[in-house]
Amino acid sequence: IGAYHSTDAGRSWDRLTDRESRIGYPDAIIPHPTAIHHYFVGGAKYNPGQWRTNHDADATVTITRDGGKSWDVVAAGLPAHLQGNVEAMAMNAWDGGLALFAGTTDGAVYHSADEGASWTTVVEGVAPVSKGGHYYNLNEKPELVAARKTRL
């Protein structure tokens, strides 16, 4: 797993990251609204198969400013260790600024007003921001989430 890039409409692909990268399992990808080649990426160091065993995604947020050739962790203000994964990111851009939001499978939402240089906690303890079985794989007591996986 990793991040890939294509310049020919998907006929061929170049690997930008690999399993040894800080984000070996990229999930949320947000392009910068005005700076070409800038992307914010949230995700986990480990893949979902490993989450099932160790209940740890070791997630963070990174940015590339050169189309994926190099990546910088932008996690000041985030917990030192994110057990859950950053599965969703959103951006609100306006003339002269932008706000980034990151949601985790731990049920936390974080906000950055300075392009990821620093983060503040918006809320913790809400329902997990997750898809499919990802939350289930990260939870040490999966029997507690059975009700969350049903539909009314």
Spans of features found by a protein language model:
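Extracellular glycan-interacting surfaces
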Residues: 1-152
